[in-house]
Every structure is written in structure tokens, then in C-alpha cells.
Amino acid sequence: MTQVVHVPLGDRAYDIHIGRDLMGQAGALIKPVLQRAKVAIVTDSNVAPLHLHRLKEALQSAGIAHAALILPAGEATKSWAHLSQTIDFFLNEKIERRDVVIALGGGVIGDLVGFAAAILRRGVRFVQIPTSLLAQVDSSVGGKTGINAVQGKNLIGAFHQPSLVLADIDVLDTLTARDFLAGYGEVVKYGLLGNAPFFEWLEKNGPALIAGDPAARSEAVRVSCQMKADIVVRDETEQGDRALLNLGHTFCHALEAATGYSDRLLHGEGVAIGCALAFETSARLGLCSQEVPSRVRAHLKAMGMKTDISDIDAAMPEPEDLFALMGQDKKVVAGQLNFIMARDIGQAFVTADVSEAVILSVLEASMDPRSA
């Protein structure tokens, strides 16, 4: 059964379809948003062999003309060079402002294609077909698009909402165990930031998600998308509540920068570590009891996930250098670094009242495998 989460943003409202075999139904689902039967698809070298043919068949059966660009897979694709290549592809395909382009892939492709759509002809529409768990529950929803800079991640971009999101649960079967767990880092984040009952549900049903239970996976994606949609509607451009979605990300982005945005640390793995460190920091500040971060770590470890910097298989900089990398975070306001802290599971909030000394002590402990 397909479930639909509606994102009510006025004339930019859209639906998120969650269910099985949505790739096979893509032509019929996309056709109503088209003004002419033509689309341009951008995907990557990992996704194309797995899913591009199926999407093309669905579009062809619906009478929709299409062309595809296949980019290299990996975080390095979120660059000026690949943005330029994508825009050249759209222009060569004569994509007009009223047309639709399709992002078929994980978070990297979704972010890149969304940004290209935002700036092409001052804004063309785009459809997200996320093929990773991380993209289905996070990056494909909410309109954040962008690329990376030398100075940090996601520092160049725009808010540009999709016209439709198709989250096909079946494509998750093609993910490696590591990639699925990386996406789970974003799923568990929703329970930690504002939905304690969902975190409890994950503690019970996490093994079923890993085992491939489609009903459990659909429910996890639905709840995650609904939570994100509710927050985005309240605060589309991250002036308030939406910042809560960055729980764990200040630590995460510094760790990603330190590992060169490479496969030594996947984004969702960094989020999981970041969430564990955010709750550890909260406990050290006296905002919550030590039992809370212990419970968070216990669940992440039970799912086979990284929880500490010492779990990263790479040489890491000193705590002071990691803290300096945090200074490039998007949540810096007037030179002040804001953190997402928590009073309990499901009770996150934004604060700048976190001393450098506390952060350094948390980083140092997390780098020591004896403290894990």
C-alpha cells in the first residue's frame, strides 16, 4: 500500500509517495505534474545500472520523452564542476522553465540536481526519486539544495522545493548494509529530536528494518517524512524550529571535513556519532541525566553503528582542530556557534550556551577508544 505525506506550502505544496514499486509507476505519477511530456534525468554511476532502465521504461510507457546524464558517484560530485556539467546538460536538452527535471539517486544527486534546478532559468521544477534510505527520510524532503565548498559542506545552495517525491521502499533492497545503516542515522535522529515514542518504536523494530521488512521500512520512512514536513511547514528557511533537524550535524560536518568528505565516513555515520556526542554534551552540561546518552549509544551500537570518533577508520585531527572546523557550520550566527542540545530523548533545542571547553572534553573522550 502506498502512503502519501502532503507538504502544504501553498502554491509550492507537494506530495511524498511512500510504497513499493513506485519506480515502475513513476511515469503515471510524474505525468500529472508535467506541462509537456519531456523530462531530463540526472543520476550517478552506482544508481544507473540498478534503477535507470526501470525508470526509463516507466516514463516510456507513459509517453514521456527523456534523456539521462550519469555523473560519478560520491560526495565529490557536489562540486562547481559537476553543477556546471548538469546545467549544460539541461540547457543542451532545451529544458524550459515550466519543464521538470528528475533527481534519481541519493542525497548527493538530490542536492546537486535541486540546486541546478533552482538556478536554471531562475527556477525549474524537479522531482526527487531518492534511492537511499538517507535521501528518502531527509535530503529529498524540504527543499534544501546545494553543493560543497573547500571551506565546508553545503555552504553554497538555495531553498527550492521539489514538485513530487517518490520514495520506493523496494530500492532499499539494493543498498549495502553500510549504506542502509548510514540512512538509519537520520531516521533515529527524528526520534531523538522530537518523538520519544518513535525512538521507542525503533528500539523494538530496528532489527526488522535491517532484515528488510517492507512494512517496518515504510512506517519508518513515513514517520520521518511526516516529522520533517511538519517542521519545514513551520520554518521553511531555517530561521527557528528547522534548525532542530541539524541534531548531530555540527559534530558530523566537522568529522566529514576532517575525513575529506570520503567514504571513510558516510554522512549518516557522522550523524549517528554526532547525535551520540550531542547527548553526551547535554549530559555534561547537566541538561539530562547520563542514562540518556547511554541509552542512545546502546541503541546505535545494537544496530551495528558507529558512536564515537574512535570508531572512524582514519587519522583524525586534534580536538582543537575539529572545533575549528565546526566554525564553518551553517548554524553560526554573528560568529557564535549554535548547538542542538537535548533535555531528554525527544526534547531537543537550539542553544549557543555551550563552552568550548566542554566540547573539547567531549571530543577528546570520544577519540579515546577506552572511553567508548
List PLM regions with ranges.
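Generic secondary-structure signature for well-ordered alpha-helical cores
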Residues: 60, 92-95, 161-164, 170-177, ...
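A glycine/threonine-rich phosphate-anchoring loop and its flanking beta-alpha core
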Residues: 115-208
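ATP/NTP phosphate-donor binding region
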Residues: 1-100
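Solvent-exposed alpha-helices and their adjacent loops that cap or buttress functional pockets
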Residues: 8, 34, 94-96, 119-121, ...
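Active-site segments that bind and position negatively charged phosphate/pyrophosphate groups
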Residues: 200, 204-320
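C-terminal charged capping/lid subdomain of soluble metabolic enzymes
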Residues: 3, 185-187, 287-372
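Short glycine/serine/threonine-rich phosphate/pyrophosphate-binding segments
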Residues: 108-115, 136-137, 254
